[in-house]
Amino acid sequence: MGAFLAVLAEVFDLASITGLSVESILSGEALTTAELLQSHINNLVVYGGLTEAEALAAVEVTPQAFAALTSLFPNFPQALGALAATEFTATGALTVGAAVSAALYPYYWDYRTPVADLNMALQIWYPDLDILFPGALPFARFVNYIDPANWAADLYRAVGRYFWERVQAAGINFIEQQMETGRELAMRSVTSLSETLSQYFENARWAVSGLSTSLYHGLESYYSQLGLSPIQQRQLARNLGHPQPYRYDLYDAPQLKGQVSATYVTKVDPPGGANQRSAPDWMLPLLLGLYGDLTPSWKDTLEELEAEEDGSHSQKAKRRKTKA
């Protein structure tokens, strides 16, 4: 076994010196490489007029690697295989012989052969201390952890490490709890805000108004019912030959008729008499959106708006690229 390991060690040394792999050396490819390299060096020396050192420098091969390659003999793989086979055969024969001899060894129940020769103890057995003295092993382990010569520093280090581990674990747990509490608080805040807004919109008094139409009608009514100014009234009375009106009476303008600016939506009580929450159909998309649910029509509308925005952004990006 030692000879085989020595040969393997030499193979690894050759691989490290020559730069070839162990597989190429064991398979015999390194022999071909060595022969080709040696013939090339000889050609450079004979026909090129170079020395051996210059030829090795020209092919970038160190003298140590060249010497290691030339030291390989042609039947090296076969010799290594024969050595391995011989080693395996010898080891197998010894193992089989030892097993057979151990199986055929005469053993009698009357203990003619001493028990000490058959069962040799590698070390003296001692009973566990915890059986006789409970708590002795933890105390001994604690004493081994603390150096008697530097017991104060070791104790301070052990207590500090334990305190730091506990503080670190408590800090991690506290941070996780705070993050979970913040998440729950944010969800509660969003839920309460949505609930408040939805109830506000449900209980609000809604009115339908056409702002542009009512504005023009209001202006028309105002100018059509607007009276004459005091100067115009005195001029008109003077032209008609009527007595001029008293100046304080000029400001008694007729009251304009009230204009209706909007129409209130009639609020219907919940059907069934259970006083459950109810809302008109036109308000459902708003309330469902506050609670996070979207109707199919409103979802399609949002998708169309997002597609338009994405298209406008892509067109702007293309314009920037073309300008650049």
Swiss-Prot record:
Residues 301-324 are annotated as: DNA-binding. Signal peptide: none annotated. GO terms for molecular function: DNA binding; structural molecule activity. Residues 302-324 are annotated as: Disordered. Keywords: Capsid protein, DNA-binding, Host endoplasmic reticulum, Host membrane, Host nucleus, Late protein, Lipoprotein, Membrane, Myristate, Viral penetration into host nucleus, Virion, Virus entry into host cell. It comes from the Viruses. A motif (Nuclear localization signal) lies at residues 311-321. Pfam families: Polyoma_coat2. InterPro entries: Polyoma_coat_VP2. Residues 261-296 are annotated as: D1. Residues 315-324 have a biased composition (Basic residues). Belongs to the polyomaviruses capsid protein VP2 family. This is Minor capsid protein VP2.
